């Protein structure tokens, strides 16, 4: 059932890292989890225009370290680092421990599923035709080296009375292959007709984990001599 399971969740620990890396005992686990949720909620709201890809949270020795992956680091940092300092103070207040914020730049936003989904959502909210937005996203991803991409939108497409789903795919997206590096994300566009959901799968290639790929061709087997059939006289 590779079509149904979450592509990121099934690959955790195989080819995908966790978005939160910390360990806590039973007493502190719920507080840490709640703190993570509030920090993510706050940063997602504050940085809604900063092309936010993902937020990674670590908790070393009674502190919190947040790494923000974004395609527009200048917007997050602000003039002379003022904005990032405000974020650090706010995160420390929410989490209740000293905070440190790192910024990581996403070099190719066209190959990041979350950024592609958000881009399509913003286009739909600006009344761009959904087919044009989908095709443009697919073409840009393939042009920059993606092995495959699939984009699906669902809802009242084009203001139709009955909601439906449409999708485009180019290349291959092997959901069953666990070593396949598939980036998956969802987004939503709030239009005048209602909410349109967007799903994006991007296949970037297979991660073999240091194992050498089998390049030696198998030896051809000797063909067995075929028995000749006797023809009728």
Curated annotation (Swiss-Prot):
Keyword hit for Coiled coil: no
Protein's organism: Vibrio vulnificus (strain YJ016)
Lineage: Bacteria, Pseudomonadati, Pseudomonadota, Gammaproteobacteria, Vibrionales
Protein name in the entry: Small ribosomal subunit protein uS3
GO cellular component labels: cytosolic small ribosomal subunit
Domain KH type-2 residue range list: 39-107
CDD domains: KH-II_30S_S3
PANTHER family to which the protein is assigned, alphabetical: 30S/40S RIBOSOMAL PROTEIN S3, SMALL RIBOSOMAL SUBUNIT PROTEIN US3C
Gene3D superfamilies the record matches: 3.30.300.20, Ribosomal protein S3, C-terminal domain (3.30.1140.32)
Keywords for the protein's UniProt record, in alphabetical order: Ribonucleoprotein, Ribosomal protein, RNA-binding, rRNA-binding
Claim: Mitochondrion is one of the keywords in the record: no
One GO-annotated biological process of the protein: translation
Described function: Binds the lower part of the 30S subunit head. Binds mRNA in the 70S ribosome, positioning it for translation.
UniProt family annotation: Belongs to the universal ribosomal protein uS3 family.
């Amino acid at each position: 059932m590779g079509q149904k399971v979450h592509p990121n969740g099934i690959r955790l620990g195989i080819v995908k890292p966790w978005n939160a890396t910390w360990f806590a005992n039973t007493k502190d686990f719920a507080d840490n989890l709640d703190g993570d949720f509030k920090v993510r909620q706050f940063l997602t709201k504050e940085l809604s225009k900063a092309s936010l890809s993902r937020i990674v949270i670590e908790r070393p020795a009674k502190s919190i370290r947040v790494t923000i992956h974004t395609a527009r680091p200048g917007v997050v940092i602000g003039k002379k680092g003022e904005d990032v300092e405000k974020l650090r103070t706010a995160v420390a207040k929410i989490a209740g421990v000293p905070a440190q914020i790192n910024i990581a730049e996403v070099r190719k936003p066209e190959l990041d599923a979350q950024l592609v989904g958000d881009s399509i959502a913003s286009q739909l909210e600006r009344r761009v035709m959904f087919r044009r937005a989908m095709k443009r996203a697919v073409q840009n991803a393939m042009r920059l080296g993606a092995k495959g991409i699939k984009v699906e939108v669902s809802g009242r497409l084009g203001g139709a009375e009955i909601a439906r789903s449409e999708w485009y795919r180019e290349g291959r997206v092997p959901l069953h292959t666990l070593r396949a590096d598939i980036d998956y994300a969802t987004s939503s566009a709030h239009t005048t007709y209602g909410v349109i959901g967007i799903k994006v799968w991007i296949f970037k290639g297979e991660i073999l984990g240091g194992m050498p790929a089998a390049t030696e061709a198998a030896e051809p087997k000797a063909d067995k001599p075929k028995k000749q059939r006797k023809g009728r006289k």
